[in-house]
Structures are given as structure tokens and as C-alpha cells.
Amino acid sequence: MKPSERRKARRLAVQAIYSWQLSGNNIADVEHEFLTEQNVDGVDIAYFRELLGGVATKKSQLDELITPFLVRPMDEVDPVEKAIVRLAAYELTFRKDVPYKVAINEAIELAKAFGAEDGHKFVNGILDKLVARTK
């Protein structure tokens, strides 16, 4: 598997997590929608499924890890940034094969692509604190 396949899986997963957060739809329906309606060429489908399903099933646990580092309530965090931080927190917590620097860098790049103007700074700050606490 190429790193670019995982990068594409993360990119698709963040979009799917965002959609799931806003719609409240069943995660299986969101997964099906993204796999059938999006371009999945070069995407590590298994990794996409793991990230999406993992964030959905571990949402409460991930939010407990993230919340101490927020300066505002979780429900006030930008939905794009929330999706990115949840995805990265999942990787940092449950995918020990992914180096923490890779998980953080990928999250920053996703925030630059999808987030608000300074969203990447917010994401970086939260994840740096999370890594420092869990190392």
C-alpha cells in the first residue's frame, strides 16, 4: 500500500465524518453513499472504512481525549475541524503503526484543504497537546 492511498482514505474519511456529524445519518449509510458516489480511485478502502467506523463507534472516547484541550465546548468547534481532530485522535490512539508525526501532519494538511483560514493552527495545537499527554 502506498502512502498516497492512505492520504486519499483520510481525505475521503474526513468528508464522510463531516457529513455524518451534520446529517446524523446511520454511519453505514454514509459509508455506502461515499463509496458509491465519490471517486475512490487510489483510495485505501479498508483504511477509509476503519477510520469512518472507528470514529463513529469511538466518538465519545475520542471526545473525552480531545475536550480537555479545547477552549470552547465541543459543540461550538467548527464541524470540519471537529471531523479532522476526531480522525487524527483515532489514529493517534488506535493505530500505533501510524507515527504520531504522520498523523499530525496529515491532519494539518486536511485542515489547510478543508478548514477555516487558521483551522490548521487549531488542529495542530490540539493534537500536539494530545500527543504530549499520551506519550
From Swiss-Prot:
Extract the Gene3D superfamilies matched here: NusB-like (1.10.940.10)
The entry's keywords: RNA-binding, Transcription, Transcription antitermination, Transcription regulation
Residues of the signal peptide: none
InterPro entries attached here?
NusB-like_sf, NusB_fam, NusB_RsmB_TIM44
Has the keyword Protein transport been applied to this entry?
A: no
- GO biological process assignments: DNA-templated transcription termination; transcription antitermination
Citing just one GO molecular function, the answer is:
RNA binding
GO terms under cellular component: cytosol
UniProt cross-references to CDD domains, sorted A to Z: Terminator_NusB (cd00619)
Q: What does this protein do?
A: Involved in transcription antitermination. Required for transcription of ribosomal RNA (rRNA) genes. Binds specifically to the boxA antiterminator sequence of the ribosomal RNA (rrn) operons.
The entry's family comment says:
Belongs to the NusB family.
Protein name in the entry = Transcription antitermination protein NusB
Q: Which organism is it from?
A: Shewanella piezotolerans (strain WP3 / JCM 13877)
